[in-house]
Amino acid sequence: MILDRFNLSGKVAIVTGNSTGLGEGMAIGLAEAGADIVGVDKDLPQNQERIEAQGRRFLGIQADLSSLKPIEGIIQKAVAAFGRIDILVNNAGIIRRNKALDFSEKDWDDVLNVNLKSLFFLCQAAARQFVSQGTGGKIINIASLLSFQGGILIPSYTASKSGVMGLTRLLACEWAPHNINVNAIAPGYMATQNTQPIRDDPVRSKQLMERIPAGRWGMPEDLQGAAVFLASDASCYMHGYTLAVDGGWLAR
């Protein structure tokens, strides 16, 4: 039965940036589909009760992904707790806003370190574990509309998210022979901490809502279906694709 292919029972998913917003929404969606969750966040993840309320197991790992130091430990702790990993959701990310003429090297490096460098090396560590298990696996990178467009005032964020889409394609090509699916989700304008400055600007917010065919801000729950699909056997023939969940923004 087709619905059985979406079932994640017995799977273990690592979700970075798991405590709030999009990461929390995807973690809960994966748990509802049957996966046990390893939540990774800069602060100790706070949503253990919500995951366990779905009848799933939860391991919280506190890790600062602005450096590569925690990465091997994340995989090791997950495997020690659950015996395996099957899914990686690379959701952790930061943003810095300023005009390109005034943008600092620190704001450039801070964003690229979290959004692209740590993402790549966490993909690498997870893929090595998938290969050693001999079972394949699923990697879901979180891209952005800025993977497709330029935007303004966020040069390092646009660069990082363009890189995420490119890396997703490259890794998919290299790792498909290992039965590893690497795909990405590009959220549209979502009601999260990252978009709070825009939502607080009535003029800018109104302009955005007039362009989005769905006529509203996206919510974390809007990514759950895409995340479950890309984490499940239903997407086994998908490699290197970036799926926009954007209320129709790119179609406009």
Q: Predicted regions span which residues?
A:
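Substrate-binding pocket helix/loop in short-chain dehydrogenase/reductase
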Residues: 99-100, 104-112, 208
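Conserved glycine-rich cofactor-binding loop
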Residues: 12, 19-21
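Active-site helix of classical SDR
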Residues: 123, 160, 168
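Residue(s) in the substrate-gating loop at a strand-loop-helix junction
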Residues: 144
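Alpha-helical segment proximal to the catalytic Tyr-Lys
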Residues: 128, 173-177, 236
